[in-house]
Amino acid sequence: MAQRSIVRTKAVVLRSIDYGETSQIVTLFTQEKGKLGVMAKGARRPKSSFGATLQPMAYTQVVFYHKPSRTLQTLSESSHVQSFHRLREKLPTITVGLRIVELVDALMEEEDPQPAAFALVVRALHRLNIAEARVSNLWPYVQLQLAQILGVAPAVDRTRVEAVTGDEGLLSLADGGVYPADGTPDQPKRASRAALRAYAVCARADLDTVMRLTMSPAVRREVEALVRDFLRYQFDDAYPDRSRSVIAQIEGAKPTDRAT
């Protein structure tokens, strides 16, 4: 018979839903166990010890009772490792943060530890919390880095990127590589030279370099479409779009925050 153990680990909250009168079911991405669901009993009571630690994007230290035969574990304790207060102050940072945790929730397998992916998510949320500009650059960067961790690294070659000398080139959805306009890659998608070069930076450069990258709104939209189409091709229906549609409704109802 499988024995119950007590697990203490760092975690990022991916999502939570109300359960019953006072509880919540919370999906965590943990450093030690990967993605898993926990029951937080009494989390919705006014004086709950969980406080705000179960909100999506929270970076926490959790203690839970783990039994391998269960699909839902029992959460005992949760406290902030780092409180990302500024992340929730502006729509652009909320947008990117929610997209990141939704993507992780969609692509991670249950109880499959992915320490590199966990470190990536924490690093991205930390940067969102402190960034003053170009926070949207994090979104294509995180997607392409996560694809690499999961075994579908974009085959971006510097020589081929530099060979794109005209106004347009090609992105291969099959391997994520950039090719000149006269190339013959599998599953080609035509794009502007500016977007392909920005895509290559997001795929190969370090985070500090990516955060210094300046893109026009048109190029940014094109880069995001390239990354989205590449991941959709690689992960099929697992690639999520729920937060995108919700955020579009929010942006349509509020003045645009230009500090992106």
Curated annotation (Swiss-Prot):
Protein family: Belongs to the RecO family.
Native source organism of the sequence: Salinibacter ruber (strain DSM 13855 / M31)
DNA damage recorded as keyword: yes
Alphabetized NCBIfam families for the sequence: reco
Keywords assigned by UniProt, alphabetized: DNA damage, DNA recombination, DNA repair
Role: Involved in DNA repair and RecF pathway recombination.
Protein name: DNA repair protein RecO
GO annotation terms (biological process): DNA recombination; double-strand break repair
Family annotation (InterPro entries): ARFGAP/RecO, DNA_rep/recomb_RecO_N, NA-bd_OB-fold, RecO, RecO_C
GO cellular component terms attached to this protein's record: bacterial nucleoid
Gene name per UniProt: recO
Pfam families the UniProt entry points to: RecO_C, RecO_N
PANTHER family, A to Z: DNA REPAIR PROTEIN RECO (PTHR33991:SF1)
Coiled-coil segments on the chain, per record: none
Upper taxonomic lineage: Bacteria, Pseudomonadati, Rhodothermota, Rhodothermia, Rhodothermales
Bilayer-crossing regions: none
